[in-house]
Each structure stands twice: as structure tokens, then as C-alpha cells.
């Protein structure tokens, strides 16, 4: 009996606590909903809202900047305009007007080129390249402007950078000429080789002539001969290249044919070598090298008589090839006379008489 009463009391307590908890939760929820209903919107400052509405959009520059930019852009003098725009960019490095300032330079450079104001063009192009180092138009403008004003050091500085971006025979020719003026033979040769194949023989002549000396000095006979042949092809008999006197041109032809002959000889084309050396002697009879190699060619052709005469003439001139010519002459003569030199003096006397 007591157990039933105890169980009844426990159940009653659970019901009471459950009701209280449920009622408490319900009351809290109602209070929260009431707070939400009573919450008022935040007040709006009408004056601040009006200011915000009238605020100008951010264009990336001030009115003062714009006026300064327009003043520079509208300068009638192209040099002053470029200087003004450059100064604006330096003064306002973050201004959105800088893009417009930069875009004005190509027009300025083109107008200076059309006006043939190369001194100003060089200055403007060089200044622009400080701001935009890889600009193709500015590189080309600087190259041509400084070449025109004979500032060859700057011409090659900007010209080589331009050639990397826009290679052409015309640019190579300008660089070759500039390096020639700067006495930089290696660079001259490099760019001359690039432009000559695209030029006609007469236009290429000055470059071919200089290259013939360049390679001959370095004992590169094949290349020297190649350019000598181009020289000889440029002007016919009776013609004289610009800048040459007739006497100098005669000497040049003698030298060129001698180099051509030497190249044929080293390639064992002895018949062609004889023709080239005879051409050289036509313009310069005192060419000891020509007589010596003619002797060697005739020896190879088993024409011993003509070979001995040629060696004798080379010896009689008393020039650098004389000693070698005498040695070759004696060797050949001994082969023909059982090791004896008896009678060789007669050949030498005849050769000496013919050379007078």
C-alpha cells in the first residue's frame, strides 16, 4: 500500500515539473517575440544621405591634375609638349591620366619624324624609352634619329634592341654603317653580312670592300675572295665607284683579283687561279705574290718553263715573295737539271729585263 502511494507521488511531481518547465519556455519565447515587435529601425541622417547622394564618382584624378594634364597636352611646341607630359607622369605616378599621357607620345614622335626634326626626335624617343623601355616605335625612332645626327653610339644602343624586335636588311645596314664609324670591325662584319645579300651589287659595294679587307687581315681567304668577287661584279670596265679616284680603283682591282686568285689556288683550281692572277697583273705589274703563285700553278700543270719565268719575275722585284720565289725556282731547276743550278742566272736576267 505504501509502495503505491510513493509511486503516485513521484508521478505527480514529474507532471508538475514538466508543466513548470514547459510554461517557463513558453513565457521566454513570448518575451523574445515581444522584443522583436518593439524594436525600432535605426535613424537615418538626412543630411549625410544627401551628401552621399551628391558625391562625385572616383575617376582616378583630381580637377587640378586634369587641368595640369590638359595644359601639357595642348602645348603647340612638340618638344615642350613631350617634356610637359613626361613631367606630369613623374609628378603623378598613380594618376589614371597617365595612360592618356603615354598614348600621346607616338603621335608626337611621328610628327617630329615628318618634320625631319631628328635632334628633337632623338631626345623625345629616348625620354619615352625611360618610361617604356621596350616600345618598338620609340626604339626605331631613337635609332634613326641618332644615326641621322651622327651619334653612332646611341644609334647602335637603340638599334640593336630594335633589330631584335624588327630584324630587316635596312636596319642591319644602318647598324653596319654605325659600327663602321665607331671602328668596331667585328660588329660591322656581323651586320654587314646580314644586309649584303638583300642589296644590289652597287649598294653593297662599300660593305663588300670593307669586308674583303676585314677577312683578308684575318687570313680568311675564302670569305675575303667572296667579297672581292662582289666588288668586281659591281662596276664594269671604265666605271669607277663613288669616292674612288681612277688610280685607287686600279689598285683595288689588282688587290681584289690577287685575293680571288689565291682562293682558287688553295682550292686547287689552278686554271681559274691563273686567270685571276693575270687580271691582277693587268692592273699592277709589280705584284710579286701574283708571279709567285703563277709559278706554282704552272709547276702543277707541268709547264716548267713558264713556272721558272714566273718565279724569276717574282724574285727580281725584291719584295716579300722574292725569297720564297728564288727557293722554289732553284728546287724546280734542280729537278730539271740533275741537281745543278748552272744556267739559272740566264733565266733571272731575262726576267729582270722583262720587268723593266
Predicted regions mapped to residue ranges:
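Structural motif corresponding to the intra-repeat A-B loop/turn of tetratricopeptide repeats
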Residues: 112-115, 149, 182, 218, ...
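N-terminal leader/linker segments that initiate helical-solenoid repeat arrays
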Residues: 23-119, 123, 345, 353-356
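Helix-start (N-cap) detector for alpha-helical repeat units in TPR-like alpha-solenoids
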Residues: 65, 99-102, 136-137, 169-170, ...
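Residue-level recognition of tetratricopeptide repeat
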Residues: 107-110, 144, 177, 209-213, ...
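TPR/TPR-like (Sel1-like) alpha-helical repeat modules
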Residues: 164, 226-236, 299-323, 330-334, ...
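Canonical tetratricopeptide repeat
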Residues: 101-107, 141, 174, 210, ...
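Terminal, low-structured helical/coil segments at or just beyond the last alpha-helical repeat
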Residues: 242, 247-254, 266, 313-356
